Amino acid sequence: MIIITGSKGFIGQNFLKYLLEHSKEEIITVHEKDAWDWIAFFNDWDKVSLILHQGAISDTTETNIDKLHAMNVWYSIELFEKAIQYQIPVKFASSASVYGNQQGIVNPLNYYAITKLQMDYYIQDHMTEFSSIQS
């Protein structure tokens, strides 16, 4: 079983299309509006072989930092903790809005980029626990 968060986004759509054409595994897609309910009630973690975590509120004009932080940071942490508990590999994507084409000091362009950078730092800080997570 493969879980894809953010399957309506560009990268998620392409992952989904590829997997539908090339994989025989069951695919579960998770969307923003039901993400918290899904993670709370999903009980088949032991059957999951891979999590493709592309889901985030990616609206670069969103100014509600609490909303962004809840979905882009806290939800991601919950998902990663499930991955650790069940030893599920995770593929996670950062964002060009965090790094752009710059060298040196990171200067996120918007609140969305700030939350993505927070997750990048979180993963770096917990790499020994998150040995199955690749960004």
Which residues does each PLM region occupy?
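Conserved Rossmann-fold NAD(P)-dependent oxidoreductase catalytic core, especially the SDR/UDP-sugar
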Residues: 77-111, 131-134
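Adenosine-cofactor binding site in Rossmann-like domains, unifying the SAM/SAH pocket
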Residues: 26-43
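Active-site Tyr-X1-5-Lys
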Residues: 109-135
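Structural motif
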Residues: 1, 49-50, 89
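Short alpha-helix in the Rossmann-fold core of NAD(P)-dependent oxidoreductases
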Residues: 69-76, 80-83, 115-116
